């Protein structure tokens, strides 16, 4: 047992405040970076980013022409960037050599490295004439640099050190929950800023001339630029609601310092002003001054949320007599990750990505590929999280699931439900906006099937729950297919049915392995109702059906010889394991079949992709 705390995931955080000189220097550095970010917004909105067409000089000179305003705006931006460098370097050097504080010099070192990277990226931006993607990355780096310096500044002040540290884990749980809540809002703000930069860079600012709806009172326009514009507004609305809800929740938390609440309240107040400014900006035709103010306010809101998050993190890690490992940042976030069942999500994304490659007969358009996987990750993660919320009482009665975040008390049920809903809605919006409505509708159907039909009804009702409910997993490859083609073809139905037939052998093998858990919890899984031997026969039966169905693409000449040979080997492997399980329906054969079925599905999709690519 040691005094807890760490740098952002590192070791050796000292919770006491540092000298006033370093504190003042860090505040000055943060203000300089904030000014740099705001000036960058002015440069971007006035179109002055190419005011100096070369780099690092300006028109081949150290000083730009006196009569060229755009050149001076860009030159001052570069000068501010150059002035931030020594401030950052000096702060890091003092934190390292004099204070010997890893929790301070590590984020400052990262910030300095990112600053050099941002300077190089700025040169690329000029040379490539401001491509929107590079501009968005440049903004993202600026926001991360500001956040790292603010985290160091808050740690240097250490407001939590004014009171004795708590001595048990329960006492820091409210602060840990605040870290997660503020962090989620911060990530949403980060995404909102990047989407806003994409709206400006892509020309989508003018796609909707009305407010709050799009042109002509349309809620969701059909064209891509209109959808991107409205996605930004919907995301802004969601972030505003989340920020307001967070302020309301923190206002009633007496165990949390009021300073954390006041920073979030300030962010929410600025956000209300920001929304009004956005509407005025649209009505006035996006004048440069208002645009710059809009982006400057965004930086101020981001800074306020980061300060609140860093303060809450310090509170969560200010403990004595608690294992330090349990208070590391990654462990404070762990409940959210575990809630989404990342192993299941990863396998679903393999089938989605595989279907996209098969449909495209090669690499899909890169942005479509990224947005489909991102949307799929959020929707499937949200569905799994909602499954955890609904099954929380059931999970408490099962040894295998009792350590999940909700039954173990690491996460409240309402907090988990909010996270599940946010992930799901965000994923569906991404698919609808950046991919196509068909993919979004199919993802929604899969979500409803898994949460509404399987989790809420079938799981507790019938031993055939997994046969019917297993169709939910079949939607993942169909979403991938529709993302590329915009429709559902016969091959997509084949992939759906493949997952449908694969699910019973996979799940019942696991149910045989964990039969005692299901029996004690009262879940009517097939091995509980019929016994392991009868369930093992059903595993063999569905494995035979799966093997036969896998040959359909060869029969219709959709896939070729490579697939035929590979499918034969994979099916023989799984059939042998299923036969052995039927002969000996015990834990060891069930475990082998369960793990093999995961590998089977992965290699099956790799095989189909390889066959399509070779066939051209």
Predicted regions located by residue number:
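Small-residue-rich segments of transmembrane alpha-helices in multi-pass membrane proteins
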Residues: 143-148, 351-353, 405, 468-484, ...
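Core segments of transmembrane alpha-helices
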Residues: 81-88, 235-244, 345-349, 420-426, ...
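Polytopic transmembrane helical bundles with strong interfacial aromatic enrichment
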Residues: 2-3, 8-336, 345, 361, ...
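Interfacial loop-to-transmembrane junctions
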Residues: 290-293, 575-603
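Transmembrane alpha-helical segments that form the membrane-embedded catalytic/substrate-channel core
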Residues: 39, 190-198, 378-386, 449-455, ...
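Intramembrane alpha-helical segments
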Residues: 120, 134, 413, 417-484
């Amino acid at each position: 047992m040691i005094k807890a705390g760490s740098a952002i995931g590192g070791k050796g955080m000292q919770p006491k405040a540092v000298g006033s000189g370093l504190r003042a220097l860090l505040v000055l550095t943060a203000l300089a970076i904030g000014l740099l970010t705001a000036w960058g917004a002015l440069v971007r909105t006035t179109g002055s980013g190419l005011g100096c067409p070369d780099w690092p000089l300006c028109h081949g000179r150290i000083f730009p022409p006196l009569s060229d305003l755009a050149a001076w705006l860009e030159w001052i931006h570069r000068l501010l960037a150059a002035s931030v460098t020594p401030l950052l370097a000096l702060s890091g050097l003092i934190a390292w050599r004099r204070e010997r504080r890893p929790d301070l010099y590590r984020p400052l070192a990262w910030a300095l490295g990112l600053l050099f990277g941002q300077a190089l990226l700025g040169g690329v931006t000029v040379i490539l004439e401001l491509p929107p993607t590079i501009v968005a990355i440049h903004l993202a780096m600026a926001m991360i640099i500001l956040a790292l310096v603010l985290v160091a500044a808050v740690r240097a002040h250490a407001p939590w050190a004014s009171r004795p540290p708590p001595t048990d884990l329960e006492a820091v749980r409210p602060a840990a929950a605040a870290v997660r809540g503020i962090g989620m809002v911060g990530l949403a703000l980060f995404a909102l800023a990047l989407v806003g930069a994409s709206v400006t860079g892509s020309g989508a600012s003018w796609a909707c001339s009305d407010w709050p709806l799009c042109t002509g009172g349309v809620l969701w326009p059909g064209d891509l630029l209109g959808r991107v514009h409205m996605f930004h507004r919907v995301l802004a609305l969601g972030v505003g609601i989340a920020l307001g809800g967070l302020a309301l929740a923190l206002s009633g938390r007496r165990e949390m310092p009021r300073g954390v609440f006041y920073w979030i309240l300030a962010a929410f107040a600025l956000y209300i002003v920001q929304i009004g400014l956005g509407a005025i900006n649209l009505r006035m035709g996006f004048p440069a001054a208002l645009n710059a103010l809009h982006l400057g306010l965004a930086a101020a809101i981001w800074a306020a949320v980061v300060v609140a998050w860093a303060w809450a993190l310090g509170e969560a890690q200010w403990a004595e007599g608690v294992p330090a490992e349990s208070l590391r940042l990654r462990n404070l976030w762990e409940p959210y990750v575990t809630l989404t069942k990342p192993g299941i999500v990863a396998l679903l994304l393999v089938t989605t990505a595989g279907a996209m490659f098969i449909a495209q007969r090669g690499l899909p358009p890169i942005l479509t590929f990224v947005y489909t996987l991102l949307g799929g990750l959020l929707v499937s993660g949200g569905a799994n999280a909602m499954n955890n919320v609904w099954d929380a009482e059931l999970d408490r009665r099962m040894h295998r699931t009792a350590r999940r975040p909700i039954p173990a008390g690491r996460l409240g049920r309402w907090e988990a439900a909010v996270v599940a809903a946010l992930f799901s809605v965000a994923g569906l919006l991404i698919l609808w906006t950046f991919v196509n409505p068909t993919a979004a509708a199919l993802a929604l159907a899969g979500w409803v099937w898994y949460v509404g039909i399987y989790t809420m009804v079938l799981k507790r009702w019938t031993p055939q729950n997994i046969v019917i409910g297993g169709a939910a997993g079949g939607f993942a490859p169909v979403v991938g297919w529709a993302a590329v083609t915009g429709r559902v073809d016969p091959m997509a139905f084949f992939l759906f049915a493949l997952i449908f037939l694969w699910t019973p052998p996979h799940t019942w093998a696991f149910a045989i392995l964990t039969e005692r858990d299901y029996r004690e919890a009262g879940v009517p899984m097939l091995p509980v109702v019929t016994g392991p031997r009868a369930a093992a026969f059903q595993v063999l039966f569905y494995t035979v059906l799966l093997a036969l169905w896998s040959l359909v693409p060869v029969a219709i000449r959709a896939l070729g010889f490579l697939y035929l040979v590979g499918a034969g080997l994979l099916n023989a492997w799984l059939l042998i394991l299923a036969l052995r399980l039927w002969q000996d329906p015990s834990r060891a054969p069930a475990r082998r079949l369960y793990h093999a079925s995961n590998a089977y599905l992965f290699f099956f999709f790799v095989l189909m992709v390889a066959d399509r690519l070779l066939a051209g």
